[in-house]
Amino acid sequence: MTRSDTAMSDAATHELVLTRVFDAPRELVFQCWTDPEHLAQWWGPAGMTPTGVDVDTTDGGAWRIGMSDGEAEYWASGVYLELAPPERLVFSFKWDPREGQPDEDTLVTITFADRDGKTEMTFHQTGFATVESRDGHTDGWRSTFDELAAHLDSGEETS
């Protein structure tokens, strides 16, 4: 895997933009975001293990994904607002209430572009309550995308 990612953020608007190139076709990268069997293999940053995946991949369908660090579980959920395979995915994102976890609803927009057989994925998340929350998510998503890249590189197929 070639790690090629860039990050931009805007303190005034509390937005996060990450761009990463994956050595995989965009159809597969998109599927990794919407297929529960794929999600169960890569979702979460290093040191976390997916513990549950429930997705209804229709416009307006709900999703909920859990992960654990071995001591505690963390759950996030939202609603799919737009699914345009393999080009664009839009969903709401919110952490379940937990002490120390920000209570904020964010919006995630992901675009997938073909780049000579590879996929350029642009991840855009808006609606952070604080710059600190945005910055924490930046580190988490970067590590999560490393997990996605490792999953893609493994060549593991789902049933």
Residues covered by each model-derived region:
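Hydrophobic/aromatic beta-strand elements that line small-molecule binding cavities or substrate pockets
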Residues: 20, 52-53, 76-82, 106-113
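Beta-strand/loop substructures that line and gate deep hydrophobic ligand-binding cavities in soluble
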Residues: 90-142
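A conserved amphipathic terminal alpha-helix motif
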Residues: 2, 127-159
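Short strand-connecting beta-turns/loops that link adjacent beta-strands
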Residues: 70, 85, 115-118
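Hydrophobic ligand-binding cavity/cleft-lining segments
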Residues: 1-49
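Hydrophobic pocket/interface hotspot
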Residues: 29, 39, 63, 80, ...
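Intrinsic-disorder/low-complexity, polar/charged segments enriched in Ser/Thr/Lys/Arg/Asp/Glu/Gln
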Residues: 13-19, 26, 50, 62, ...
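Short beta-edge strand/loop motif at the mouth of beta-sheet-based domains
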Residues: 17-18, 37-73
